[in-house]
């Protein structure tokens, strides 16, 4: 057979993102046939992915995608093995691709997601897309979780991908305002959206702590009750989203901000890398 040209190797790399040496070896094995070489690489990528599949994935990043025309969005947590890879361009793009896939194709489970035709290249599956990056970087990677929603959405992901938020409201919303609210949730990590959404056992625990602290002052019982009540009011203001002072303007609460914009909070999803065991 004729020698494999550098142009052919580059063309195969452009189509698969596989390392140059792997591309050359695949083209050699396929006698220069580009499509056969792609199949060879896909099989090799799957084999590499399987070998690395048992390695711990303690690092990763959060990615979000919103289609404002279709009023649909998703947030995902992608896992990998090391912090440098979590910040690498191929992994960042992969996480963004998976968020887009979830938003547009609505898979019910991670397994269904992996089996779907990849939205940007339907000839391959989502699992094939992940396997390409695994083969390129040589680390185990996986989709840890995702959440998809429809409606008026906003999102924000921290620059290092460690934390991200997807927020859903009712009403005509300014995208920048929803981004700001999402950023606030990322930074302040509220325990719930509203006071009535806080788990009762958590409220009971905080009340007990507040009363114990109040009793330690040695004040009369009626004063103790007022001190404990004040401590709980402070705790709710620090812990409940709509009662928290807005991070960019603490003269108003997040609830005031949304109400002033004619918006009603429906809910939010906040992901942090590593919250779930890998």
What is each of the regions a protein language model found here?
Residues 2-278:
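N-terminal assembly/interaction segments in proteins that build large macromolecular machines
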């Amino acid at each position: 057979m004729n020698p494999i040209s550098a142009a052919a190797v580059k063309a195969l790399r452009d189509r698969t993102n596989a390392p140059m040496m792997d591309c050359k070896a695949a083209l050699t094995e396929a006698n220069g046939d580009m499509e056969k070489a792609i199949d060879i690489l896909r099989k090799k990528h799957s084999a590499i992915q399987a070998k690395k599949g048992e390695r711990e994935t303690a690092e990763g990043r959060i990615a979000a995608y919103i289609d404002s025309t279709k009023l649909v969005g998703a947030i995902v947590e992608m896992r990998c093995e090391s912090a440098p890879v979590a910040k690498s361009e191929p992994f960042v793009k992969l996480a963004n691709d998976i968020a887009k896939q979830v938003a547009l194709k609505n898979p019910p489970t991670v397994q269904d997601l992996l089996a779907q035709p990849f939205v940007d290249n339907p000839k391959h599956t989502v699992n094939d897309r992940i396997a390409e990056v695994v083969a390129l970087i040589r680390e185990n990677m996986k989709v840890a979780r995702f959440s998809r929603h429809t409606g008026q959405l906003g999102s924000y992901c921290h620059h290092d991908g460690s934390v991200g938020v997807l927020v859903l409201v009712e009403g005509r919303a300014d995208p920048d305002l929803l981004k700001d609210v999402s950023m606030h949730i990322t930074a302040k990590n509220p325990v719930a959206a509203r006071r009535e959404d806080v788990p009762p056992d958590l409220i009971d625990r905080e009340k007990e702590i507040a009363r114990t602290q109040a009793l330690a002052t040695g004040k009369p019982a009626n004063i103790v009750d007022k001190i404990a009540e004040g401590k709980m009011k402070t705790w709710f203001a620090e812990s409940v989203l709509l009662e928290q002072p807005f991070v960019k303007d603490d003269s108003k609460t997040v609830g005031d901000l949304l109400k002033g914009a004619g918006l009603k909070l429906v809910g939010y999803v906040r992901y942090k890398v590593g919250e779930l065991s890998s």
